[in-house]
Structures are given as structure tokens and as C-alpha cells.
């Protein structure tokens, strides 16, 4: 039974599910734990916001984050961008320090954030409009050309 559950979770996290529907109540502020272990809040009303939910133990996420970081200059013209890890603080810090350039805003997601955005696997990319509404969500790897 455990194997079936693990296989189910794996399959869900590998599928692409793109949708442009607005879901959940608008969120105007995002509070998460930064890599220093402090809780910080981000105002989500300045620009549309891209949030990438990822995990340092998941191979596809480890592939996607450097791609996201490589496209950050272009993305920041129109979006605020944050990547929220579903991993513990120490392992996330270790992976980020050894694999990224330090320009991508990284944090640790909380259960409240994951519930708010109905995160059931990763990677998950969502885009919020300036009213805090989800206007795009896609599970799975997003290739370089699509960022």
C-alpha cells in the first residue's frame, strides 16, 4: 500500500496541469521563512508575482531553479519572483549555496502557504496578479524557453 501511495504522489508531481482559472481568495501579503530562519512578509501588490514551489531533494526541481535564476533579469522587469522550498532550512541552504548564484529570492514554504495555494506536489509555478489572485498554475518542469 505504501508503494502505491508513493507511486501516486510521484505521478502527480510529474504531470503538467496548466490552468488559467482564478482560485482561492486573494492574498495581498506572503509571509515565509527566509534562509536566515527569520519570518518575512512580502507585499504582493506591486507587480504580478511568480512563486515557484520546489524541493531540494527532487531532481526536477534542482534542474528548474538554475533555469529560473538564469532568466531572472528578464522576469524581474515584469514580475516579483520567489522560490519557496518544501524542504528543511539546513538542506535548502546547503543546496542553494552549492548550486545557485544567490540572486534568486529563496524561502521556506509553510503549511499555511501550501494550503492557501493548494500545493500537492512540486515543482509548481503559480503567477499572482496584483490583486493577489492566482491567474496561472502549472505543475512540472518549465523549460528555459518558457520562462
Predicted regions mapped to residue ranges:
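C-terminal motif of bacterial Sec signal peptides marking the signal peptidase cleavage site
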Residues: 11-13
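Sec-dependent signal peptide recognition
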Residues: 1-7
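Short, small/polar residue-rich loop motifs at catalytic or cofactor-binding pockets
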Residues: 26, 47, 120-122
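N-terminal "domain-start" segment that seeds a small globular fold
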Residues: 15-42
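Short active-site neighborhood of thiol/selenol oxidoreductases, capturing the structured segment around
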Residues: 40-62
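Short, internal strand/loop/helix patches
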Residues: 97-131
Amino acid at each position: 500500500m505504501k508503494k502505491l501511495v508513493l507511486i501516486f504522489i510521484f505521478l502527480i508531481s510529474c504531470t503538467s496541469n496548466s490552468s488559467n482559472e482564478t482560485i482561492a481568495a486573494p492574498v495581498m501579503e506572503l509571509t515565509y521563512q527566509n534562509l536566515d530562519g527569520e519570518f518575512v512578509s512580502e507585499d504582493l501588490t506591486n507587480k504580478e508575482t511568480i512563486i515557484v514551489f520546489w524541493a531540494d531533494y527532487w531532481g526536477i526541481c534542482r534542474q528548474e531553479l538554475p533555469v529560473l535564476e538564469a532568466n531572472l533579469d528578464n522576469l524581474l522587469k515584469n514580475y516579483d519572483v520567489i522560490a519557496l522550498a518544501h524542504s528543511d532550512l539546513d538542506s535548502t541552504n546547503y543546496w542553494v549555496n552549492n548550486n545557485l548564484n544567490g540572486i534568486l529570492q529563496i524561502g521556506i514554504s509553510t503549511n499555511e502557504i501550501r494550503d492557501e495555494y493548494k500545493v500537492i506536489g512540486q515543482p509548481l509555478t503559480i503567477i499572482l496578479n496584483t490583486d493577489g489572485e492566482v491567474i496561472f498554475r502549472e505543475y512540472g518542469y518549465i523549460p528555459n524557453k518558457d520562462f
